């Protein structure tokens, strides 16, 4: 079955190249996933400065894997799956852990995780049914990711310096507005595309 999308992917399902999917970009993505338990542990023990360093390293690997994949034409189906998964796991684990140590309100994390679960379910259904549903990122989706990351980073940074988290109230309001709006937009777009004939 051909991969849906506009990118040309390196063959990672070739039986003569069983490890073709394990290139440098994908290895960097896997490293990012492996850093998540370290990141969670540092947050739980409130070693916020070290947690920020781990986030910085994760961010560097995120930038490098995409750059290398494009420059060396090493984009694969495995990478297309793992890269957003790693980003989402990193963000979600941050929200859940920071809520567990009472630095982020639980309701915020519930909204964030519920939106992500809805998108994950929609993506899985689209792949399973081979539906004509466009799951490409939108402006709202990218804005949501940026604001969520900024919020988590600043919560950790302010906590490491014992500063008042109420300073982030305007950012929190904006982040939640984007989170809810993007979730509803993806839901609406998926509903419309699901009812349209396949192209």
Where do the PLM segments sit?
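Alpha-helical transmembrane bundles and membrane-interface segments of multipass inner-membrane proteins
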Residues: 2-199
């Amino acid at each position: 079955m051909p991969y849906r999308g506009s990118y040309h992917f390196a063959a990672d399902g070739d039986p003569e190249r069983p490890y073709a999917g394990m290139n440098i970009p994908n290895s960097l993505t896997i490293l990012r996933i492996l850093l998540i338990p370290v990141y969670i542990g540092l947050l739980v023990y409130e070693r916020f400065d070290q947690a920020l360093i781990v986030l910085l390293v994760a961010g560097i690997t995120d930038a490098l894997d995409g750059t290398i994949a494009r420059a060396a034409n090493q984009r694969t189906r495995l990478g297309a799956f793992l890269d957003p998964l790693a980003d989402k796991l990193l963000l979600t684990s941050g929200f859940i852990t920071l809520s567990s140590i009472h630095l982020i309100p639980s309701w915020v994390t519930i909204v964030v995780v519920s939106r992500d679960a809805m998108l994950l379910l929609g993506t899985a259904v689209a792949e399973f049914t081979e539906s004509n549903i466009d799951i490409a990122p939108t402006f709202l989706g990218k804005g949501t990711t940026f604001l969520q990351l900024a919020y988590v980073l600043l919560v950790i940074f302010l906590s490491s310096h014992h500063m008042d988290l109420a300073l982030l109230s305007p950012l929190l309001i904006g982040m939640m507005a984007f989170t809810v709006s993007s979730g509803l937009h993806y839901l609406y777009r998926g509903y419309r595309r699901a009812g349209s004939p396949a192209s």
